[in-house]
């Protein structure tokens, strides 16, 4: 992309979830971030002011609904309403991390489908398009009646490992059956076979590794997942792979939620390196030496430009 974008009708705004990523995206596109402010009334209510005219403009709002999830979601909904009332031509939400995505179905009776509720709220507020990255459940796209561009970070993560020249004995590992499609995409790019961890989860945030489907003995394993939350799944998988004869274990994910005991578990695990993206802003206390972060700014910036110019974005899905 060029260093400067000349269409004055294109505007990019950032809320509070990931300002640093938003600045990187704006730089990739070649424009300055729009002027807005997010403040709070004395009772905690959110107040948003858009400090420039956006009448007739095509606006892109960068906001992940990561921790604090409800605060960030409410900021987004209020911002959408403000943009709609200020006569924006289109309101495009760029949500690198879609919170509540793991509540995509009724796992038990009398449970909500919160991922659908969030989609309803975003649409009802006035959004006209969504751009997002590696949703936990791809079928969430069907919860929206507006266009949604669902990008993935597989190419970015694959290129990282390809450039490290880890040898010919690579195996890409899915930590569960649900991640096989993602693992296969990476395996195809790295020209490597795949293995699958067969696990059972007795209760939320507790994972038990049961079996390894595939040959990992004498291999360098790369575990790929969409979200690492408490890191129970990924660290138990790494331990199981080493016990099965893997020589080294690397791990990567699109969304480093990293809650509770995650950092301690990763630090004490046999994982050589954990590679994550910056879809979620990480505070200093969530950094350890064996972590490395890759930026999705170029991918999201390219998507914004292509959408704005009515160009195809299909090559970004590959």
From Swiss-Prot:
InterPro entries with a match to the protein in the record: PRib_PP_synth_CS, Pribosyltran_N, PRibTrfase_dom, PRTase-like, Rib-P_diPkinase, Rib-P_diPkinase_bac
Binding positions for D-ribose 5-phosphate per the UniProt entry: 201, 225, 229-233
Protein name: Ribose-phosphate pyrophosphokinase 1
SUPFAM superfamilies: PRTase-like
Cofactor note as given: Binds 2 Mg(2+) ions per subunit.
Subunit and partners: Homohexamer.
Keyword Cell inner membrane appears in the UniProt entry: no
GO biological process terms on file: 5-phosphoribose 1-diphosphate biosynthetic process; purine nucleotide biosynthetic process; ribonucleoside monophosphate biosynthetic process
Gene Ontology molecular function terms on file: ATP binding; kinase activity; magnesium ion binding; ribose phosphate diphosphokinase activity
Subcellular location: Cytoplasm
UniProt record similarity statement: Belongs to the ribose-phosphate pyrophosphokinase family. Class I subfamily.
Cofactor annotation: Mg(2+)
Stated role: Involved in the biosynthesis of the central metabolite phospho-alpha-D-ribosyl-1-pyrophosphate (PRPP) via the transfer of pyrophosphoryl group from ATP to 1-hydroxyl of ribose-5-phosphate (Rib-5-P).
EC number(s) reported in the record: 2.7.6.1
Binding positions (Mg(2+) 2): 176
Primary gene name: prs1
Metabolic or biological pathway, per its Swiss-Prot or TrEMBL entry: Metabolic intermediate biosynthesis; 5-phospho-alpha-D-ribose 1-diphosphate biosynthesis; 5-phospho-alpha-D-ribose 1-diphosphate from D-ribose 5-phosphate (route I): step 1/1
Active site: residue positions: 199
Lineage: Bacteria, Bacillati, Bacillota, Bacilli, Bacillales
Pfam family, one: Pribosyltran_N
UniProt keyword list: ATP-binding, Cytoplasm, Kinase, Magnesium, Metal-binding, Nucleotide biosynthesis, Nucleotide-binding, Transferase
Main location class: cytoplasm
One of the record's GO cellular component terms: cytoplasm
Catalytic activity from the UniProt record: D-ribose 5-phosphate + ATP = 5-phospho-alpha-D-ribose 1-diphosphate + AMP + H(+)
